[in-house]
Every structure is written in structure tokens, then in C-alpha cells.
């Protein structure tokens, strides 16, 4: 599936010429794609020598449209089936509640899944499944709510349902909603899109803690150190934000990708790529990541050691699976494709669509094959789109309702045994923490924390301190943390261990003790700022920054420590990544904004970092991509954008109805997806955020503003272009020499603020005082919708808090609006345009040390 964003959620294609000649689309009808049996499909798949795929399940076993897969402690498989996903080219009836989570069991424990039940049916596109003990967490589409289900009579069908986390509705396209729900080493549960993590809290509702957004879309994975790996489709990066655990920030560094990493090498040439010609080679193969998803870090013990620790990521549009070889040098993680102009797995079957991968209890890797013709959601296959023409050209929309699960095995290994961990004692589970298969270690830790049995604390402490297996020690440490039984002496033992990875875990796990009040550990943490290992130094900087953050405030002088550690290090990696960690800022809003405005801005930042960043970048400069010219981005920059900075209605209209065509003189080949399905508050939040970020300063937009504009554009079909949007917005009327201008201070120069001369200005010469005013008399009474004051030549002299009044005779005044200035360009929009002959701006509050100035004054919607 395609997942991307374009202010806030879209996929853009950018011209990319990898060859001298450019592919020119040809939509001549072709023979419709064939539906192959699993046995026939297998013959189309290329794998490296020694590897093979085994069929585990298919539509013969009743599965349809599988999208996610996971295992419980007894090795039973749960599959989320999106049975209404794109059943025709328009995605008709997609939100009918007929999706299921199916359960599959190997009754003979031989890896042959021969018992099949519908664990839960009548669901709305179930997207996340997390087995606990005999309970299972499930989340459906269009909601953030997560319910806990239980099969109480052993028939394989859930018969109880209780709310676990109530998050409320989730609006937007189904491809731009959360996925993942993985229980990670730090005992927190993570998802994509949502800038928070959850923690099991017994029978109570979960703990919830805000975190940076990882920028993931479909799929989540963790490695042996508990670091989450995120995939990115809309930004066409493949994998990203893998430098640090996401708790500390979503960081990327130059050179983390091998030079050609983002180029892909399919076996099949069908140009059903959202990027169109710009993403297509002359042989019609995809030339670049465009739908990356379903990643997994190989952690099983029944696959070659050379593969373990590498990340596999699917590219379903390219019908391939990329292997990312992972190396760490000087604290910086690097990834590369080990196959020259080829891939780990690829197929010539057009319907080969791997959308997820997971490590299995048997030490092998499981691949979820949606097996379908059309993979993009209907929003990107609308009438007139490039993609629709290709879909119809090959009849891709006619292949649906299938699904396969494959097991990746190697000739040198036999799959391992099936587990019965749900029936094991806590003591037996402690022993499983030493298992060579990461799935067993993860599951044992999760079950121990769920049981909450502290009788095993001595055994866990012994394992953590004295095992010869570093991975066992790591899991024991975090299990103690999850049970609330971690002691400072255990943390200190890790902080001084010879293994640098264990020192890092000592820092990370020790944070929970500092947050609980044991600040004595900070002195121990500080010693690692001079550690000989770059990764340990970086972790000490991240730990210091986290503990000193405004939300925690447990490390008062953290800035001094971080600066010292960064300056003292001779490591290039510490210098590069450490500087990024140190300077990253999450601040939004502030004291210049009212409480309700700050609330909108914070919500807008959350939305932006969940959705919009994938195309516009975290810094609002546009997501950089490869192309024939340097500096190409997948979407236009938002800083200094006329649409964003201009009349407030512009960005709202763009969000509601989308945009297409050239933007700022540059052509981006796909249109912006309309976001009208989201609430007025949602639109207001993200619009206000982009208008007050990336160097922009503009009036905050309210939900009432959005409701008004939504009513105005009701019935509009199609999207805006730059030209049509500009024509639809109220005009700015420049000042005229016919205006009579006066002021409470320096009235003799008041006309300078309305002379349309950028070289002159009116200025009070004294500090702003309550009651100061500036007045304009128009030649005739006119309908005015707002005012705009520009003081670029004196940027700090803007009015901090002011009101605007109107009058027909200069004696009786009526209120037009009251607002506060934010920058050198101040805007005041009236709740409704009113007829007035006089306008008076009056300061509501004094401002010490700053005069009031106006360089250019304009009226909005002068008629």
C-alpha cells in the first residue's frame, strides 16, 4: 500500500532521469494479468542461493487480503485481513465492517498450520494486533481505540471485548493511519503516526507518554538492542530515523545511506508507480523506493548468521524485498544494499505484494503476501490519474480477494520447535531470556512483565549480572525494569561493564530510576560522557537531554554536561550526530499566544509530524529526493510560502480541496490530496502550525474560520491551482493618498504608514502605551474584512495586543476585532466584513522598550 503525505497527506512524484532517455507512458491495452496458484507464483520468485520460500497459508485456507501477522506465546498465528480493501478500482464499500482477525494453529506443532478460526469478525479493516497472554489487543481503522479480546472457552474465537486504550476517532485516508503496536524491549508499546507510546498497567488503562514521531507508515520492527526501525513510503526514503531510539528524537545524518540505496531493481516491468514516468526506467521497472513497508530485523536463529541483524523491507510496488546491510561506525549507523543492481527477493508475478514480515517462533521469517493486482488505495487511482490508466491497461483491479503467507528458510537449517510459553512457569520463562531466537526472548520478557510475579527477581538479577550472554543480560535488565524491581546497583554494574552495548542499556534503563527520584545515578551517567566508545557517549548525551527536558526536569545542569561531552570528544560520529541531538527543538507556541491558540499549535505540530513531514520535511523545506538537479524535493517548501503566509483563507482552502499544478513556479507531478474529511479543529490546528513555523508568523486560524470556509467551498469539485486559489481569496488593498491618517503620537508623520513607500514609516518614538492609537479615514464608507500592518524595517516594533474599531462618523465606534501581533507583519481578520468609513487601531497593553511602527498599511477585502 502507498503511504504518503502532501500538506498534510499526499504522494508527489518528481521527475527523475536515471537514463539519458526518459520513459514516455504508453497506455496501450495489454493482456490482463493472470492469477497464479501459489505453486505457480513460487516459480516467479528469485532468492539468493540456499534460500527458499515455503507456503504456509493461502486463500485455500480461507485468508483474504492479509496485511499483518503476529504470533502468541504458543506459536498461534493471528492475521489481520483487510477484506474490503480495494475490491474494485474505486475502493467501493471499503468501510463495510466485514474485516477479520483470523487465528491459525499447528495442532501437531510441526509448522503446518492446520486449524483455522475467525478469532474476531465483523471488523472495520483491522490493522494492528498484539497478542499478550491469553488476551489480544486489536485496533481497527478510523479509530485510535484499542480493545483487549479474550477467548474464554478455547474454541479459537474471541468472546469478550473490553476497552484498553480510548483514543477517539482517527480521520483521514486509511493508508495514513497507525500501524505497528509492538511491545519493545523498554516495555513500552509503539505505533506509527501517533506521537505517543503506551505501557501496560495491569487491569487499568495504559500509561501514555508523548514521544517524537518516528515518521513510520506501515510496519514497525525492533533490533536486538530494542531500537525501532521505521519505514517511509511517502518520502521515498525506504528506512529512516534509525540512528537512535525514537524516545530521543527522529534523527538522520548525511551518509547514513549508501549512495545508491534508494534505487530499486525489480524483475518485472509494469509501470504502475504513483510517481509515473519520473519513477520509471525505460524497461518500465520502478527506479526508486515509493511504497516501502513491512520491515523486519532478522533475529531468528534458523537463518544464516550473515543475515541476522540486517533489515528486510518490502517494496510491494516493485514486487521486491530489499535487504539493508547494517553497520555501525563511530556511533553512526549505515545501511547498504549488498546486491549490485539486484534485490534479496523479487518476483515477476504482478500480484506478488509483500506488505509485512515478521520473525517466527521457529527461527524463520514469515512474509505476508497480499497477492493482488492494485496495491494503491483509491485516493490515488481517481479518474484522470496516471495510475488509473495503468491499472486499467493491465486489468490490475480484477485481482483481489486472495492472500498468501510464506516462510523464508535456508537449506542449512531446519525450522525450530513450536513454543508452549503460555503454559510455562515464570522460572521457565526466565530461562527463555537466553534463547538464541529474538522472538523467544521478546515473548518471554513480555509474559514475565504481564504476570508481574516478583518471585523471579533474584533469578533475573543473577542473569543480568553474571550471564555470559549479553543479549540475555540485556533482556533480564529490562524485565527487572518492567517489573518495577530494577535497583541502582544493577544499573551501576551495567554502566561499568566492558561491553559498550551493556553500558548503553545501563544508561537507558537507569533513566527510569532517575525519573522516579534517584538522582544519585546522574554522577555515574556523567562519567560516560568521556567513554572511549562513541555510541556510549552519544547515549549519555541523549539520556542527559531527556532527563533535563521540560517534561521531566530531573537533570538540572544537563546542558553543561552535553556541551562538554560534545566538545571533548574527538569522534566524528559524536560531533555530527551529537550536534543534531543537542540542537533539536520541539518548542511550539509560547507566551505570545493565548492558551487556546497554544493548544491548536501543539495539536498542529502533532499532526504535521504524523503526516505532513513525509513530503514537506521536519524543517518545512521539503523532503529532499534524488533527481537530475540538486535540491529537488518531493513537495514545495512551507517557509515563505505565499499560500501559507498570505491570507489565512488560502491555506485552509488548500487543505480542504487540495492543490494541483505548478506551485511557486515549480511543477510537482501529483496533486495534493483534499483533507476535507477531517474536522474543523484538525484543519485549523495544522494550518495554524504551518503559519507559525519554519520562519512563518501569521494569525492563528480557528475552527470557526474553517467552518466558514468549508461552507463557502461546499459543492466545489476538483482541486485548486495557484491561479484559481489566488483569484478566490480576498484582495489586499494598498494604502491611498486619499486616506486621511492621524495618530495619538507623532501624528504629523502618520501618513508615512499609508504612503505605499517602503522607505518611510510612522513610528511613535516612545514605548508602546495602553491607549495609543492610529486612525484612518477612508474617502467613502467601504466594506472591510481585516487589516494588515507591515513594519519590516522595524521588525520588533509590532503591537503586542491591540483592538480594531470602526465608525461611520468618527464619533460612534463599533468593535471590529481584537488580537495580538506576532511578528513584523500583523494581521487582524474580522469575524465578518463590515461597512466603515473610519478605522482605529488602539493598543490594549503597554510594551516596555519597544515603540510602535507601521511601514505599510493595507485593508483586506476592500469593496
Language-model segments: residues:
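The canonical Cys-X-X-Cys-His
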Residues: 368, 405, 604-619, 672, ...
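Short inter-helical turns and helix N-cap capping residues of alpha-solenoid HEAT/ARM repeat scaffolds
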Residues: 436-437, 468-469, 498-499, 532-534, ...
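Aromatic, loop-rich ligand-recognition surfaces of beta-strand-rich domains
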Residues: 748-863
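Structural detector for internal amphipathic alpha-helices that build alpha-solenoid repeat scaffolds
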Residues: 416-419, 441-452, 471-485, 490-496, ...
Amino acid at each position: 500500500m502507498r503511504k504518503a503525505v502532501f500538506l498534510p497527506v499526499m504522494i508527489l512524484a518528481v521527475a527523475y532521469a536515471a537514463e539519458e532517455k526518459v520513459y514516455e507512458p504508453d497506455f496501450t491495452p495489454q493482456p490482463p494479468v493472470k492469477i497464479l496458484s501459489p505453486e505457480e507464483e513460487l516459480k516467479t520468485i528469485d532468492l539468493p542461493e540456499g534460500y527458499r520460500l515455503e507456503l504456509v497459508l493461502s486463500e485455500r485456507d480461507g485468508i483474504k487480503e492479509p496485511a499483518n501477522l503476529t504470533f502468541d506465546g504458543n506459536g498461534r498465528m493471528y492475521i489481520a485481513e483487510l477484506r474490503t480493501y480495494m475490491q474494485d478500482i474505486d475502493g467501493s464499500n471499503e468501510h463495510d465492517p466485514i474485516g477479520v482477525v483470523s487465528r491459525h494453529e499447528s495442532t501437531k506443532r510441526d509448522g503446518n498450520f492446520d486449524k483455522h478460526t475467525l478469532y474476531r469478525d465483523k471488523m472495520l479493516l483491522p490493522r494492528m494486533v498484539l497478542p499478550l497472554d491469553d488476551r489480544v489487543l486489536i485496533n481497527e481503522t478510523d479509530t485510535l481505540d484499542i480493545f483487549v479480546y479474550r477467548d474464554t472457552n478455547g474454541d479459537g474465537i474471541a468472546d469478550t471485548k473490553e476497552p484498553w486504550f480510548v483514543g477517539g476517532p482517527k480521520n483521514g485516508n486509511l493508508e495514513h493511519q497507525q500501524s505497528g503496536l509492538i511491545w519493545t524491549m523498554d516495555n513500552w508499546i509503539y505505533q506509527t503516526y501517533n506521537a505517543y507510546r503506551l505501557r501496560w498497567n495491569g487491569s487499568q488503562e495504559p500509561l501514555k507518554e508523548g514521544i517524537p514521531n518516528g515518521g513510520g507508515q506501515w510496519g514497525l520492527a525492533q533490533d536486538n538492542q530494542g531500537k525501532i526501525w521505521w519505514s517511509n513510503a511517502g518520502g521515498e526514503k525506504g528506512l529512516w530515523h534509525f540512528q537512535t531510539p525514537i524516545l530521543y528524537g527522529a534523527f538522520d545524518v548525511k551518509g547514513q545511506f549508501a549512495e545508491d540505496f534508494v534505487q530499486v531493481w525489480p524483475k518485472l516491468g509494469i509501470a504502475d508507480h504513483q510517481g509515473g514516468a519520473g519513477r520509471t526506467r525505460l524497461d518500465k521497472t520502478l527506479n526508486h523506493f515509493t511504497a516501502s513497508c513491512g520491515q523486519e530485523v532478522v533475529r531468528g536463529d534458523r537463518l544464516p548468521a550473515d543475515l541476522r541483524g540486517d533489515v528486510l523491507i518490502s517494496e510491494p510496488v516493485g514486487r521486491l524485498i530489499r535487504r539493508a546491510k547494517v553497520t555501525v561506525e563511530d556511533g553512526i549507523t549505515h545501511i547498504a544494499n549488498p546486491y549490485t543492481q539486484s534485490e534479496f527477493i523479487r518476483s515477476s508475478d504482478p500480484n506478488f505484494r509483500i506488505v509485512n514480515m515478521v520473525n517466527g517462533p521457529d527461527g524463520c521469517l514469515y512474509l505476508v503476501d497480499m497477492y493482488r493486482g492494485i496495491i494503491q488505495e483509491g485516493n490515488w487511482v481517481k479518474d484522470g490519474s496516471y495510475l488509473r490508466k495503468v491499472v486499467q491497461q493491465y486489468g490490475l483491479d480484477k485481482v483481489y480477494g486472495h492472500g498468501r503467507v510464506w516462510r523464508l528458510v535456508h537449506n542449512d537449517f531446519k525450522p525450530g520447535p513450536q513454543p508452549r510459553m503460555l503454559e510455562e512457569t515464570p522460572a521457565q520463562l526466565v530461562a527463555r531470556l537466553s534463547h538464541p531466537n529474538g522472538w523467544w526472548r521478546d515473548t518471554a520478557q513480555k509474559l514475565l512483565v504481564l504476570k508481574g510475579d516478583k518471585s523471579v527477581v533474584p533469578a533475573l538479577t543473577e542473569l543480568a549480572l553474571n550471564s555470559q550472554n549479553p543479549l540475555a543480560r540485556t533482556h533480564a535488565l529490562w524485565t527487572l525494569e518492567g517489573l518495577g524491581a530494577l535497583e541502582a546497583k544493577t544499573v551501576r554494574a551495567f554502566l561499568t561493564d566492558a561491553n559498550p552495548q551493556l553500558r548503553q542499556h545501563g544508561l537507558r534503563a537507569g533513566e527510569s530510576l532517575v525519573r522516579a527520584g534517584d538522582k544519585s545515578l546522574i554522577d555515574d551517567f556523567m562519567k560516560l560522557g568521556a567513554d572511549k566508545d562513541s555510541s556510549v557517549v552519544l547515549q549519555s548525551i541523549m539520556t542527559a537531554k531527556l532527563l533535563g527536558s521540560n517534561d521531566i526536569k530531573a537533570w538540572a545542569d544537563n546542558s553543561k554536561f552535553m556541551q562538554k561531552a560534545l566538545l571533548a570528544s574527538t569522534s566524528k560520529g559524536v560531533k555530527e550526530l551529537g550536534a543534531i541531538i543537542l540542537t533539536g527543538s520541539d518548542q511550539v507556541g509560547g507566551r505570545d499566544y493565548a492558551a487556546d491558540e497554544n493548544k491548536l499549535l501543539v495539536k498542529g505540530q502533532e499532526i504535521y509530524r504524523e503526516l505532513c513531514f513525509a513530503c514537506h520535511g521536519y524543517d518545512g523545506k521539503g523532503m529532499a529526493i534524488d533527481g537530475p538537479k540538486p535540491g529537488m524535493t518531493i513537495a514545495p517548501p512551507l517557509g515563505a510560502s505565499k499560500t501559507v503566509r498570505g491570507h489565512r483563507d488560502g491555506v485552509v482552502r488548500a487543505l480542504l480541496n487540495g492543490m494541483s499544478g505548478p506551485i511557486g513556479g515549480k511543477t510537482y507531478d501529483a496533486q495534493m490530496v483534499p483533507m476535507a474529511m477531517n474536522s474543523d479543529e484538525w484543519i485549523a490546528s495544522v494550518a495554524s502550525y504551518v503559519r507559525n513555523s519554519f520562519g512563518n508568523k501569521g494569525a492563528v486560524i480557528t475552527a470557526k474560520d474553517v467552518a466558514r470556509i468549508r461552507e463557502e467551498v461546499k459543492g466545489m469539485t476538483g482541486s485548486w491551482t495557484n491561479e484559481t486559489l489566488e483569484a478566490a481569496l480576498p484582495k489586499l488593498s494598498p494604502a491611498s493618498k486619499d486616506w486621511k491618517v492621524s495618530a495619538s503620537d507623532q501624528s504629523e508623520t502618520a501618513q508615512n504608514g499609508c504612503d505605499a513607500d517602503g522607505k518611510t514609516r510612522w513610528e511613535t518614538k516612545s514605548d508602546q502605551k495602553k491607549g495609543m492609537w492610529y486612525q484612518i479615514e477612508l474617502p467613502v464608507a467601504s466594506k472591510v474584512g481585516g487589516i494588515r500592518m507591515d513594519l519590516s524595517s522595524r521588525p520588533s516594533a509590532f503591537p503586542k495586543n491591540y483592538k480594531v474599531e470602526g465608525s461611520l462618523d468618527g464619533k460612534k465606534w463599533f468593535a471590529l476585532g481584537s488580537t495580538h501581533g506576532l511578528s513584523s507583519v500583523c494581521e487582524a481578520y474580522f469575524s465578518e466584513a463590515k461597512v466603515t468609513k473610519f478605522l482605529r487601531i488602539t493598543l490594549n497593553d503597554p510594551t516596555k522598550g519597544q515603540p510602535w511602527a507601521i511601514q505599510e498599511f493595507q485593508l483586506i477585502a476592500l469593496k
